[in-house]
Regions:
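Intrinsic-disorder-associated, low-complexity terminal segments enriched in Asp/Asn/His/Tyr and depleted
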Residues: 1-4
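Structured catalytic-domain cores with a bias toward divalent-metal coordination
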Residues: 7-203
Length: 203
């Protein structure tokens, strides 16, 4: 704990700290966030902009075999330069590590649950529920905006589209719609779901 305090005590006006990872203004840091209760770690990149601004969180790999989103986020995190960034970006590269490793399409192998259906999760639950709780409490709670990347797996061909949430009140619906309009996609669909990663974050 004392070493962690020393690492993250730079005193800068803009700082992004998650678990044992700390990025100060103009820095990009990578590391791991341990899931509540142990068992797995989540790979993160923190990008702390040189200028102050809101915090965006982007996640991928909620479904382990949806590799396109994982690749896209990996490329984005490499390309973003914190010195040219206003605000912060939290990149959760793989939300479902064992499914990603073992090519399991829809579920967390250890408990057979669909991670995208157990949010906001449980602190003392099964692995899926603890992953969801960790993402909710340790990552989403720090974000002003959130994008969850999904894709077809290797056997699917999916038209690019974006869902935006309209179930969490007028203000969030308006912000979500504006984010969807900024996406370069022809298909945009409103959603009243409440249990997925992004839907739960809106509540």
């Amino acid at each position: 704990y004392s070493a962690h305090q020393k690492i993250c005590s730079g005193g800068g006006r803009n700082m992004l700290e998650i678990g044992m990872i700390c990025a100060e203004a103009g820095e990009k840091k990578t590391g791991w966030l341990e899931i509540e209760g142990g068992g797995q770690k989540l790979p993160l990149t923190l990008i702390c902009g040189a200028k102050e601004g809101p915090t965006m969180m982007i996640s991928a790999g909620v479904h382990g075999a949806e590799y396109i989103g994982v690749q896209a986020l990996s490329e984005l995190s490499r390309e973003l330069d914190p010195k040219d960034t206003a605000g912060n970006v939290i990149c959760l590269h793989v939300a479902n590590p064992s499914a990603f490793r073992d090519y399991v399409r829809f579920f967390v192998p250890e408990d057979g649950k669909n991670l995208n259906r157990v949010f906001p999760g449980k602190k003392d639950g099964t692995l899926s529920e603890r992953i969801a709780w960790t993402i909710t409490e340790k990552l989403q709670s720090k974000a002003d905006y959130y994008i969850d990347l999904h894709a077809g797996d290797t056997s699917e061909e999916v038209m690019p589209f974006v869902y935006y949430n309209v179930a969490a009140g007028e203000k969030i619906a308006r912000v979500s719609a504006n984010m969807a309009m900024a996406a370069d996609m022809e298909v945009r669909a409103s959603s009243t779901a409440t249990t997925g990663a992004y839907s739960s974050a809106c509540q």
